[in-house]
């Protein structure tokens, strides 16, 4: 069973294909006011909010989330999030793909 320490990951990204896995992970650390631009993937993406307060946009819906919340974006759903809290937000992003594939929409 392969083991990878998070400190060895480039920018917190673990692409599953390089480790024989069918999923890829991002350990995201967003400072207040930060987050990715609107984008989508050809596979589902799931986030586990570990710390922080964020607003997710999924299609035209906006969702306020915090620690312990899990957000799921289906394949092809446009989405983004913003850390609108006062402290760093920490999330685990699970991509249902052995490689990252992103279409940036803005």
Predicted region positions:
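Structural motif
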Residues: 46, 53-55, 62, 78, ...
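Short glycine-/acidic-enriched loop or helix-start segments at secondary-structure transitions
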Residues: 67, 82-83, 103-104
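Ligand-binding loop in jelly-roll beta-barrel domains
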Residues: 75-100
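Short, charged/polar surface micro-motifs in flexible loops or helix N-caps
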Residues: 20-23, 30-34, 51-53, 62, ...
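Short, conserved beta-strand element in jelly-roll/cupin
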Residues: 29-30, 40-56, 94
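A short, N-terminal "cap"/entry segment at the start of jelly-roll beta-barrel domains
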Residues: 1-23, 27, 37, 103-106
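Short acidic-glycine-tyrosine-enriched beta hairpin
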Residues: 60-75
């Amino acid at each position: 069973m392969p083991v990878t320490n998070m400190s060895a990951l480039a920018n917190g990204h673990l692409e599953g294909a390089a480790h024989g896995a069918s999923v890829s992970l991002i350990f995201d650390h967003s400072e207040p006011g930060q987050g990715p631009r609107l984008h989508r993937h050809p596979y589902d993406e799931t986030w586990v909010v570990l710390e922080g307060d964020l607003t997710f946009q999924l299609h035209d819906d906006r969702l306020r989330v915090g620690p312990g919340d899990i957000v799921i974006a289906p394949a092809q759903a446009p989405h983004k999030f913003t850390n609108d809290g006062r402290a760093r937000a920490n999330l685990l992003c699970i991509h249902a793909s052995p490689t990252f594939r992103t279409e940036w929409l803005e």
